[in-house]
UniProtKB/Swiss-Prot annotation:
Top EC class of this enzyme: transferase
Active site, per annotation: D368 (proton acceptor)
Any GO BP annotation: ubiquinone biosynthetic process
Naturally occurring in which organism (per UniProt): Mus musculus
Domain notes: Adopts an atypical protein kinase-like fold: while it adopts a core fold similar to that of well-characterized protein kinase-like domains. The KxGQ motif completely occludes the typical substrate binding pocket. Nucleotide-binding opens the substrate binding pocket and flips the active site from inside the hydrophobic core into a catalytically competent, solvent-exposed posture.
Protein name per Swiss-Prot or TrEMBL: Atypical kinase COQ8B, mitochondrial
Membrane-spanning segments: 93-109
Domain Protein kinase positions: 192-424
Function: Atypical kinase involved in the biosynthesis of coenzyme Q, also named ubiquinone, an essential lipid-soluble electron transporter for aerobic cellular respiration. Its substrate specificity is still unclear: may act as a protein kinase that mediates phosphorylation of COQ3. According to other reports, acts as a small molecule kinase, possibly a lipid kinase that phosphorylates a prenyl lipid in the ubiquinone biosynthesis pathway, as suggested by its ability to bind coenzyme Q lipid intermediates. However, the small molecule kinase activity was not confirmed by another publication.
Recorded name of the encoding gene: Coq8b
Catalytic activity, EC: 2.7.-.-
């Protein structure tokens, strides 16, 4: 868990889209063809040519032109291309089998080449993986092509590995997964049409005035298309790749077995419990009805919030594998670096305020730290929140103890950090002193913003490097897995801290947390829990 947290603070948090507009982070697409009036036989099926029955062709054209004037047109990555998604488990297994054979042959060819006169072994990388014959350029391309073809859980893991630090993964392997993170292919029109018909019915065109044929975003689970409802509402329609929901467990097992065998992933990177948690989270993300319900929950929770807004769900375009939402504008957080210091400070303060509200007030958090899920609109000075597939609840038995761990760190009380970590079941109490000291130090480092009496300079700290130095001890000497809630929670908190660091925020966090702390226990109508004896 600390490995993931430290690495998150060193890298970007998932695929960063350019003006992404729907809960589906990823690369963005080429200029699309519209399914609309008089454009094709499909377009004609949604054309409303009778008075009062919908938008005319001119209406749609004017709406589209108005939209283009508001914001730059998103585009898919140059590496993205149309490619069929293997939908059956057999076809997906065949893809992994082909990759295994290809990696083996590629490694053999690499060894042979280096064994010839004039050949030499590579020595790059600090993790001991740099000299692996499996990490040739040809094999790198095989891995990228396979993951971008199968997509789903396998691509999701590849994107997760892209944010790991090269203290644990060789620079070559890191570059491979960085290419995976930036390159997501989209399914062909016929396959997308099949999903739409299976989910919305053969008459699905009657629900929209137009829908773009090529997506503006493509990621690990699905792709996103821009559309227009008959009342003129612009929408973004997320369509899930076929077969990904049914292949989560097999994809995870096949990919990790292959990578451990060929390139030697670090021991402890994906422990058994973290794998189970990952599979559960992926299953949640594949259930678009659940995501729609979570989005509606957040829309209600934040209805009166002056800074954050949540787009409305389009119920008639919502099924298990299709999700329609109101189209939102704005720029991802990473593109806010050019704004004034004051605006950046306000954005980051509000982001931390949201994290604390989610965990300690709502006890319900959207845990995906992808910056493209937070779109800042300068005209309204608001942030639109997107992608609620990874939302989850937290019980009071967890938050009661977790808030005390943070409070102890904010107060600089190392002994209480250790004790409350045991109460939280983060520790057993029988760990080595080296492990206990490393754990407490990591918590104290993360608590520094809440301990500072004045504005904390997120851009000047070395939080990531300091935590990264503790991770080897934390991996080697852990006696029990951390609470399962912390995997997703710490990814989200790390993403928030990283955003503050990237935007060089200077904000006073101590009063923000202290106010949250007192409000929390007031709402619980009880006193803070004493440390267990």
């Amino acid at each position: 868990m600390w490995l993931e947290l430290g690495a998150m603070l060193r890298r970007t948090c998932g695929p960063l889209g350019r003006a992404v507009r729907l809960p589906c982070g990823g690369a963005l697409g080429p200029r699309p063809h519209w399914w609309g009036p008089c454009r094709s036989c499909l377009a004609q099926s949604v054309h409303q040519d009778q008075p009062g029955r919908g938008l005319s062709e001119d209406d749609i054209r004017r709406a589209r032109e108005a939209r283009l004037r508001k914001a730059p047109r998103p585009q898919l990555s140059d590496r993205s291309r149309e490619r069929k998604v293997p939908a059956s488990r057999i076809s997906r297994l065949a893809s992994f089998g082909g990759l295994a054979v290809g990696l083996g042959l590629g490694a053999l060819a690499e060894v042979t080449k280096k064994s010839l006169p004039g050949g030499s072994l590579q020595h790059e990388g600090v993790s001991g993986l740099g000299s692996s014959p499996f990490l040739s350029e040809a094999n790198a391309e095989r891995i990228v092509q396979t993951l971008c073809t199968v997509r789903g859980a396998a691509l999701k893991i590849g994107q997760m590995l892209s944010i790991q630090d090269n203290s644990f993964i060789s620079p070559q392997l890191q570059r491979i997964f960085e290419r995976v993170r930036q390159s997501a292919d989209f399914m062909p029109r016929w396959q997308m049409m099949r999903v739409l018909e299976e989910e919305l019915g053969k008459d699905w065109q009657d629900k929209v005035a137009s829908l773009e044929e090529v997506p503006f975003a493509a990621a690990s689970i699905g792709q996103v298309h821009q559309g227009l409802l008959k009342d003129g509402t612009e929408v973004a329609v997320k369509i899930q790749y076929p077969g990904v929901a049914q292949s989560i467990q097999s994809d995870v097992e096949n990919l990790l077995a292959l990578l451990k065998m060929s390139v030697g992933l670090p021991e402890g990177l994906f422990a058994e419990q973290s794998l189970q948690t990952l599979q559960q989270e992926l299953a949640w993300e594949c259930d678009y009805r659940r995501e729609a319900a979570c989005a509606q929950t957040f829309r209600k929770l934040l209805a009166d919030d002056p800074f954050f807004r949540v787009p409305a769900v389009v119920q008639e375009l919502c099924t298990t594998r299709v999700l329609g939402m109101e189209l939102a504008g704005g720029i991802p957080l990473d593109q806010c670096q050019g704004l004034s210091q004051d605006i950046r400070n306000q954005i980051c303060f509000q982001l931390l305020r949201l994290c604390l509200r989610e965990l300690f007030e709502f006890r319900f958090m959207q845990t995906d730290p992808n910056w493209a899920n937070f779109l800042y609109d300068a005209s309204s000075h608001q942030v639109t929140l997107l992608d609620f597939g990874a939302s989850r609840a937290f019980g009071t038995e967890f938050t009661d103890h977790y808030i005390e761990v943070v409070k102890a760190a904010a107060d600089g009380d190392r002994d209480r950090v250790l004790q409350k970590s045991q109460d939280l079941k983060f520790l057993t109490g029988f760990e080595t002193k080296a492990f206990s000291d490393a754990h407490v130090e990591a918590v104290m480092i993360l608590g520094e913003p809440f301990a500072a009496s004045g504005p904390y300079d997120f851009g000047a700290g070395e939080t990531a490097r300091r935590i990264q130095g503790l991770i080897p001890v934390l991996l080697r000497h852990r006696l029990r897995p951390p609470p399962e809630e912390t995997y997703a929670l710490h990814r989200k908190l790390a993403g928030a801290f990283l955003a503050c660091a990237r935007l060089h925020a200077h904000i006073a966090c101590r009063d923000l947390f202290q106010d949250t702390y007192h409000r929390y226990w007031a709402s619980r109508q009880t006193l803070p829990l004493p440390a267990a004896s």
